[in-house]
Amino acid sequence: MRSVPKLCSAIVLTWTLAACGSLPSQTFDHSVRAHIKRIQVVPIGTPEHAQARIMNPIGAGFGLVGNFVESQRAAGATQVVEGALADAHYDFRTSLANSIAQAVSKVGFTINRLTGARPDKERSRFLSKYPREKKVDAYLDVYATYVGFEAPQSSTAYRPRLELSARLVSAKDNTILFQDRIVYGCTENTDEEAVLVRADDKLSFRNRAAFQADPTKTARALQSAIDATAWELAKQFM
């Protein structure tokens, strides 16, 4: 396993990789760092909504009826999270883009941010083409497949979870300089090949009602997870 600060639940990652597909990793070759000074961050791909889910819900063991009940429960939890973030006037999409740009700039790159929207069909995959920019050495392409909260089981607390994929592409010849997945929200050890960040035990919510009880806390918890994930991405270039 690659060196990471903390490790994650094998069950969680197995489900995630099965759902999203594994991403071949490519570490950053620091020998090219002398030639990569200016990075343009393209618009970040994000889900339509912040989400909340239970990885192993109790109802899943009761066939189709149980699965239907759990799907309705998950939809309700997601609505609660969305409502809490709206009450806190918090936009996770803007926050994610800002945190990534700020984190990568802290490791020595000059950052430009491409304005405009990411194509809808490429919201959850890497861009098929990049702009031609003479004053840029590489493009940082990031998309998130999950942003929100997750509980391992029905009886356990929710904690923030992020799943994002990142690729650094040479502006000169479109060579892939770096590629990997970053997953925040891990709780136990695993041998899964991904850059994993352990969840902060202090950022927990006993149930979905807790999201609404303190919307500011909900937003701050998600922001903390976003900042930690962005910094872990930036560290890959150090």
Regions flagged by a language model, labelled:
Residues M1-I11:
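Bacterial N-terminal signal peptides that target proteins for export
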Residues C20-F109, W231-M238:
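A structural "domain/chain start" motif
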Residues L23-Q26, D120-T175:
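Surface-exposed short loop/turn segments
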Residues P47-E48, R118-P119, T145-F149, V183-N189:
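Solvent-exposed loop/turn segments at secondary-structure junctions
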Residues V80-H89, A171-A230:
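Short secondary-structure boundary motifs at beta->alpha junctions and helix caps
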Residues L85-V147, R208:
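Short, solvent-exposed, polar/charged sequence segments at loop or secondary-structure edges
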